[in-house]
Structure formats: C-alpha cells, structure tokens
C-alpha cells in the first residue's frame, strides 16, 4: 500500500480492501452541522449502514471533517484507513 490521496470511489474501494469482511463505518456530523438540512432527514431506507455504499454527495457531506480530510484532502496511511474498519 502506497500512501496517497484517496477520493470518492477510490476511497471506498480502499476501505473495502483494507477492512475486508469486517466492513467499515463513519461518524456523521450532527444534523445542525450539515450544509443541507434535508440531508439529515433521509428516509430510513437510505440511512447508512456499516460498509454499504452511499450516494456520493451524501457520503462526502457527512464525512467532510473525517476520513475525507484524512485521505482525500491530505495523504492517507494504511493505519488511518484501518481506523474506519468495524
């Protein structure tokens, strides 16, 4: 694994590779912190579950201060990715 910028589908693919059967997770920001208040009011069928792909816009909005900052904006290590595994 080479430390590099991982964004969008490349980031999700890397998480699947690193986490394998354990799956992965993220911690969304509180609804008041979201740019679009409608995002926090998604249908229960759209609520993210560990290791499931989400619509990219929702995923990027909810993760803006976490894994995206660590791995897309900055360069990410294998160990940083493992922090998001279940």
UniProtKB/Swiss-Prot annotation:
One of its GO terms (cellular component) is extracellular space. SMART domains: IlGF (SM00078). One of its GO terms (molecular function) is hormone activity. Disulfide bonds join 7-72, 19-85, 71-76. The keyword Disulfide bond applies. InterPro entries: Insulin, Insulin-like, Insulin-like_sf, Insulin_CS, Insulin_family. Belongs to the insulin family. This is Insulin.
């Amino acid at each position: 694994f080479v430390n590099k910028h991982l964004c969008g589908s490349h980031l999700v693919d890397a998480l699947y590779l690193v986490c394998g059967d354990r799956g992965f997770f993220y911690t969304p920001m509180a609804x008041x912190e979201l740019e679009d208040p409608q995002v926090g009011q998604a249908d229960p069928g759209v609520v993210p579950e560990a290791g499931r792909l989400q619509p990219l816009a929702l995923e990027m909005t909810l993760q803006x201060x976490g894994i995206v900052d660590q791995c897309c904006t900055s360069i990410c290590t294998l160990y940083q990715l493992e922090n998001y595994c279940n």
